[in-house]
Amino acid sequence: MSSSKKESRNNAKNFIKNFSENLYPNSNRVYLNNSDKSIKVPVRSVELNRTEIIDNNNKIKYEENSPVMIYDTSGPYGDPKSLIDMKSGLNKLRNKWIIDRKDVELISKNLNLENKNNNFKKNIDHYISKKNRCITQLYYAKSGIITKEMEFVSIRENMNYEYSESEAKNNKKITPEFVRKEVASGRAIIPSNINHPESEPMVIGRNFFVKINANIGNSSISSSIEEEVQKLIWSVKWGADTVMDLSTGRNIHETREWILRNSPVPIGTVPIYQALEKANGIVENLNWKIFKKTLLEQAEQGVDYFTIHAGLLLRYIPMTSNRLTGIVSRGGSIIAKWCLFHHKENFIYENFEEICKICSCYDISLSLGDGLRPGSIKDANDEAQFAELYTLGKLTKVAWNYNVQVMIEGPGHVPINMIKENMTKQLKYCHEAPFYTLGPLTTDIAPGYDHFTSGIGAALIGWYGCAMLCYVTPKEHLGLPNKEDVKQGLIAYKIAAHAADIAKGHHISQIRDDAISKARFEFRWEDQFNLSIDPNTARSFHDETLPKSSGKNFHFCSMCGPKFCSMKISQEVRDFAKNKKIIDGMNKMSEIFKKNNNKMSLKK
């Protein structure tokens, strides 16, 4: 092991031992309850300072500012009172809910026992649905049953904010019944494998907050288990709603076990990667038997959603021959090579119903992968891309017949003027199943800055109705992202998702914006920092030029200085206008102006 790799691994080990870094000063962990207090939903509450008001008598008064609630994905890592032992894993939040429904049983022969080298202190029970019982959130929703997961989600999406009577009537308040209807219709999913009880329920659908996925995972030449667990914790602290483990290197199974047992968010995988490892890296040796065993192992382990490239058909492959960048999806290229070598139809497509049966036994959601997504803006919206999308729509109906939850994956590289067509066709072809896109990147000229190029596309497609955005880091096209890259990618995508929520008119999305704008106008610097998406960076930028604590009391920053601050001048104008005599005089002059037919009368 090289010295740099050893150093990275040791840094990750130290991070895991001391992961209590405070990313959000002046924030408290708050739990919101349902009516019988059987559910505790975590949110982050940002405490704000009072507003200083000078009345007409030149006396100082104070006005309280309510705390701002912020959606929190950090799970126990965001609660300073939590005692976490990585080798034991997180508490099983959903275990009682799952068992109380009385439709699961312990797995008699656990395939995961073949992988004993996981170093966990506790034996993990693994479940499967009882014979002739369906346990998916989609089945419950279609049956009119509101699950604890649905109730949890409704509280999480509302965060106890008050709604006006008209907003409540217009379905802006997200009730458990609203969640149930969205899941039942297929417009939303709640990824929740019964063998991942550590996860906190979340919903993916266009009528909810836009969600963010972070990709982590090792490669054959980089990273360790410790570094991937570090990235997991870092991801959820910075706001990842789900995490995909895309490991392609050594110890795939053990890496995933550590990630699952310590993850408060749903975990997705691309099973073909591990299946290829089982085939010794030789694509031609892949077959349905290997792939099925891989699915079962991951199902029993607790993976919440599978990305499978079932829509890439043999007859679509020639459509890519004139592309500038060919097939850029790793899973897609594997399937394409297998199909061409054997001159057979995609074995995932051929066995799709069997896959649905497996998923329904564990409540695993399917993320139908876009193996023919464009890898450059020149290839965007071509025949191959939309042929696959049309097939994914057909497969969606098949999965729904087995009560399996489905979302659809999308591009990729798409110029701004072609983005909306992707959303329009996805809704039409795929029956309004949630859309989950990688960006899209809107230009190909910025390696090292593709979190910007893709953030532009992500904000737009989120506005148009995309339910979840897969982040892109600065390392896209260049290398495996490290901890700092993960942070930068997540920040870019949290901004894009938030901008999309505002554009969609999500009722509570703008509360944070209004609070920070009010703090900015009132020169409450600490509140500005604490409400921002990255408080420590905002504070450090301010302190580069005004480092003293007294600088937090100034009514200006170093951009404009004390004499040219527009907000300071605006405040002075507002205070000046509060004088009743001035207002009366201005109103009087306004009436004179109107009587003179809107003409000025100048007296010498």
UniProtKB/Swiss-Prot annotation:
Residue numbers binding [4Fe-4S] cluster: 557, 560, 565
Cross-referenced Pfam families: ThiC-associated (PF13667), ThiC_Rad_SAM (PF01964)
GO cellular component: cytosol
GO biological process: thiamine biosynthetic process; thiamine diphosphate biosynthetic process
Cofactor(s) it depends on: [4Fe-4S] cluster
Domain of life: Bacteria
Positions bound to substrate: 215, 244, 273, 309, 329-331, 370-373, 409, 436
Gene3D superfamilies reported in the protein's UniProt record: 6.10.250.620, Radical SAM ThiC family, central domain
Amino-acid positions noted as binding Zn(2+) in the UniProt annotation, renumbered to this chain: 413, 477
Key words of the record: 4Fe-4S, Iron, Iron-sulfur, Lyase, Metal-binding, S-adenosyl-L-methionine, Thiamine biosynthesis, Zinc
Gene Ontology molecular function, alphabetical: 4 iron, 4 sulfur cluster binding; carbon-carbon lyase activity; zinc ion binding
Pathway assigned to this chain's UniProt record: Cofactor biosynthesis; thiamine diphosphate biosynthesis
Enzyme Commission number, as recorded: 4.1.99.17
Cofactor note text: Binds 1 [4Fe-4S] cluster per subunit. The cluster is coordinated with 3 cysteines and an exchangeable S-adenosyl-L-methionine.
Catalytic activity: 5-amino-1-(5-phospho-beta-D-ribosyl)imidazole + S-adenosyl-L-methionine = 4-amino-2-methyl-5-(phosphooxymethyl)pyrimidine + CO + 5'-deoxyadenosine + formate + L-methionine + 3 H(+)
Entry similarity comment: Belongs to the ThiC family.
HAMAP family: ThiC
Protein's job: Catalyzes the synthesis of the hydroxymethylpyrimidine phosphate (HMP-P) moiety of thiamine from aminoimidazole ribotide (AIR) in a radical S-adenosyl-L-methionine (SAM)-dependent reaction.
Subunit structure: Homodimer.
Protein name in UniProt: Phosphomethylpyrimidine synthase
Species: Wigglesworthia glossinidia brevipalpis
